[in-house]
Amino acid sequence: MFQFVTPVGTQNGLKATCAKISPDGQFLAITQGLNILIYDINRRTVSQTLVTSHARPFSELCWSPDGQCIATASDDFSVEIIHLSYGLLHTFIGHTAPVISLTFNRKGNLLFTSSMDESIKIWDTLNGSLMKTISAHSEAVVSVDVPMNDSSILSSGSYDGLIRIFDAETGHCLKTLTYDKDWKRENGVVPISQVKFSENARYLLVKSLDGVVKIWDCIGGCVVRTFQVQPLEKGVLHHSCGMDFLNPEDGSTPLVISGYENGDIYCWNSDTKSLLQLLDGSLYHHSSPVMSIHCFGNIMCSLALNGDCCLWRWV
């Protein structure tokens, strides 16, 4: 079960908007205003502040695989890569709307970004050039992900209700996943809010704006697990709440972690679908929607809309 470790405080009264654990599990990158705070998880203190050149707030951030750089996506349509020691390395300009999601490939030489402009762009992080633009969807592309151990494929999720798998090198669409008979509702499609590959890249964790979390078999193109809390009266949530896989360090079955609008966090066994734990938001420091969930090893970071950021440990 999860044990609460500590709340993560920010500076100057500004609330956190994004939070991600570093690849070595030692640090937490937190966006605050137009800056990034590097929080030392073991010492429980802010060890560094990175200043960005963004003109508008962040949408997302991610660490490079070597833990030396952080990429940021902003509402100002731009993307920046900042080195922890040397500062700003690149500013990528090319999207024509806010950038929503981004991820590095395993080697760190490519950065994939997605935007409200309905496209995915592939950037060369070494020379700072745009390599390819993928016209991926008919609505905003709100999530992209690359498998941890396989950089040959890329997944995307969009407000058009579709999930796509691409060849990361050519940009060719390999597969389109839909919710079949459930894909279209009376009031339209159910927008996708987040996608996340499993460690072996065989499965894709997908969350939609109706709060439902599903595991897709990427090869078979079918849903193999569905996780759902109490049905929603209006069918669609007001916020895009976070979710992630947690892969326990003891090698046991991965967990599916999902946050919700009332501040609750649900933890399921990904194989049996059994609910292992419910973290009550009213008791565990979250009194507003859980916008972000990020896991590394046995550590989970949760971030709420009101800026409350918390660290947890699976024991």
UniProtKB/Swiss-Prot annotation:
PROSITE patterns xref list: WD_REPEATS_1, WD_REPEATS_2, WD_REPEATS_REGION
Ranges that cross the membrane: none
Major subcellular site: nucleus
Highest taxon in the source lineage: Eukaryota
InterPro entries: WD40/YVTN_repeat-like_dom_sf, WD40_repeat_dom_sf, WD40_rpt
One GO CC term, this protein: chromosome, telomeric region
Keywords noted in UniProt: Chromosome, Nucleus, Repeat, Telomere, WD repeat
Per-repeat ranges for WD: 53-93, 94-133, 136-178, 187-228, 238-278, 285-315
Cellular compartment(s): Nucleus; Chromosome, Telomere
Assembly notes: Component of the Set1C/COMPASS complex which consists of SET1(2), BRE2(2), SPP1(2), SDC1(1), SHG1(1), SWD1(1), SWD2(1), and SWD3(1).
Name the record gives this protein: COMPASS component SWD3
